[in-house]
């Protein structure tokens, strides 16, 4: 892949509308709500002794801003200028822009940062997985710049492989069917077409299960060279694999979770009813965190596998 991971990510995430669309995910998709609520709980209970943080693949600042509100100085690091611009806007609105340093860069190169530069290092919503085939090296570099705690979420193999046999999986998590988000409208308008065109392909499932790759690497590279904007080649981790990588780089007291493992069992009609009632929503998200933190379900999170540990 050489440096294709960086080039593909740069083209994908620097599309002009990325900042606005990503900033609205929690108003659009229920799985995003569940995942981010889980991470927020984990962060807020792990800030003892934390004064500085590095947010790798920080996007629109969902967690950079959260930590800055707690008085922490955050380095917001992302490959996308539209995302950074949106994060700056939101940080200004929240009154915490003076506590955030915005840096444009790729996770494949963290050489600008010295060992143990940050009390807390975090990287959420799978940017590590988008660095294939450099994902292990990137984890090692994130650990290297960590002084106290590291928290990451990567693409989950056990959580994602089933979706090769479910082309309408995202429909389950649509919160607002009237959303103008192009992805929402595509999910709704193409639902019957996706069902009609589906056929079970055992070979593709076995290949994804064994390799951690749900897409064809060479076809993705070809699409990029032809001027298209393909989705990043994404590496999906097994739980024990991720834990062993972290251990190899010296991380201790590791725990894993699968945000979305409980929510994925509930139909859209019920999920929407829960989300639209503040009391039910709060109780639901609290229970999701408890259930999804059970190590026996960590691999079956909606898309992501969460890990935290200490240096």
Task: List each language-model region with its residue ranges.
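Conserved class I S-adenosyl-L-methionine
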Residues: 1-48, 50-57, 62, 151-212
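Class I SAM-dependent methyltransferase SAM/SAH-binding core
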Residues: 62, 66-97, 101-109
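A short acidic, Gly/Pro-enriched loop at the edge of an enzyme's catalytic core
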Residues: 112-120
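A short SAM/SAH-binding and catalytic strip from SAM-dependent methyltransferases
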Residues: 120-134
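A short glycine-rich, Lys/Arg-flanked "PGG" loop and its adjoining helix->strand segment in the class I
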Residues: 136-149
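Short alpha-helix
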Residues: 233-250, 256
